[in-house]
């Protein structure tokens, strides 16, 4: 039986048009895409009719990134295929797979994804990268931005780019040389403006998932690398992330956690530098109010 891919009835659009946030818009139509051709078809139809399109992966966003009153493109779980290198250090995942499922694929290799958002059981690769998710454990070190190796992207005009393929890069340069030149001009403009350069460098020393990754103009000299890293955190506004190849991180077999009490918040903050030297992957500060909220809970 052929699976229905288009919904326009009020009940289904209401159900599928929600995410984990507090905001509400009802899409006019929901398109379920399971391959690149589906994506290109929907983008072409929206271009022809002048309708906007919003991408939805797991729908775990809290800020309304996946709601729309126009066309909603929902990624099917069977979109694309998984490919893992011999030692598991590189892994290509399609946009429709959840972070938890990706880690299940990597577990036999003793590896895992760098980004580990709290919603990893439901959040899918496309959304994790498009929102530059990292979770509490890895901050700015092993987030999506710093662990991607390659990406397959579909743009609004239907153009396809596989950054791992020299042939795809050549084809894209022939059709989109203007875009690549603009990226390099933006980079030159930043380099010629010391104040702008310093501001970008200081901004991205801290954990920052908001807005476009302007640091890509300073971190990379190749326009394809700049473009790929601009996709991270772009929330679907620059193109459709079809698949991502990650540089995976070790999944340590031995793990431990500790609850440490300090006489004051000041003393707790003084422990940050020593904890960094111990390579602690995550630390959470809880004040008396936080402890009071759970002190009567069993366990």
What are the roles of these predicted feature ranges?
Residues 1-29, 45-53, 58, 278-298:
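N-terminal accessory segments
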Residues 60, 119-129, 234:
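Conserved A3 ("GATE") glycine/threonine-rich loop of ANL adenylate-forming enzymes
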Residues 11-22, 26, 119-120, 199-213, ...:
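Active-site-adjacent loop/helix segments that line or gate small-molecule/cofactor pockets in enzymes
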Residues 13, 36-39, 121, 267, ...:
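Short acidic loop-to-helix transition motifs that present clustered carboxylates
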Residues 62-67:
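Short glycine-biased active-site loop of nucleotidyltransferases that positions the nucleotide triphosphate
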Residues 20-53, 71, 75-117, 129, ...:
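N-terminal glycine-rich flavin-associated loop
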Residues 130, 138-141, 148-299:
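C-terminal substrate-binding/cap subdomain adjacent to the FAD-binding core in PCMH-type
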Residues 57-60, 118, 166, 288:
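Short, ordered loop/turn segments at secondary-structure junctions
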């Amino acid at each position: 039986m052929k699976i229905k891919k288009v919904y326009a009835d009020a009940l289904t659009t209401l159900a599928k048009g929600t995410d984990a946030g507090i905001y509400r818009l009802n899409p006019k139509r929901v398109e379920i895409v399971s391959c690149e051709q589906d994506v290109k078809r929907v983008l072409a139809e929206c271009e022809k009719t002048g309708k906007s399109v919003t991408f939805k992966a797991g729908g775990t966003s809290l800020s309304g990134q996946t709601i729309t009153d126009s066309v909603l493109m929902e990624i099917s779980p069977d979109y694309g295929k998984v490919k893992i290198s011999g030692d598991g250090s590189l892994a290509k995942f399609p946009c429709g797979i959840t972070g938890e499922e990706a880690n299940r694929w990597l577990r036999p290799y003793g590896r895992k994804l760098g980004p580990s958002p709290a919603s990893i059981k439901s959040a899918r690769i496309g959304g994790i990268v498009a929102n530059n998710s990292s979770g509490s454990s890895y901050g700015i070190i092993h987030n999506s931005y710093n662990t991607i190796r390659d990406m397959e992207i579909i743009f609004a005009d239907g153009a396809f780019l596989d950054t791992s393929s020299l042939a795809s890069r050549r084809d894209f340069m022939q059709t989109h040389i203007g875009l690549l030149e603009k990226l390099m001009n933006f980079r030159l403009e930043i380099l010629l403006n010391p104040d702008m350069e310093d501001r970008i460098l200081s901004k991205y020393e801290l954990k920052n998932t908001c807005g476009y990754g302007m640091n890509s103009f300073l971190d990379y000299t190749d326009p394809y690398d700049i473009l790929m890293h601009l996709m991270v955190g772009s929330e679907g506004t620059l193109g459709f992330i079809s698949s991502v190849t990650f540089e995976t991180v070790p999944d340590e077999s031995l793990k431990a956690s500790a609850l440490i009490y300090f006489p004051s918040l000041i003393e707790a903050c003084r422990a940050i530098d020593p904890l960094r030297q111990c390579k602690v992957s995550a630390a959470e500060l809880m004040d008396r109010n936080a402890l009071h909220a759970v002190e009567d809970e069993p366990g």
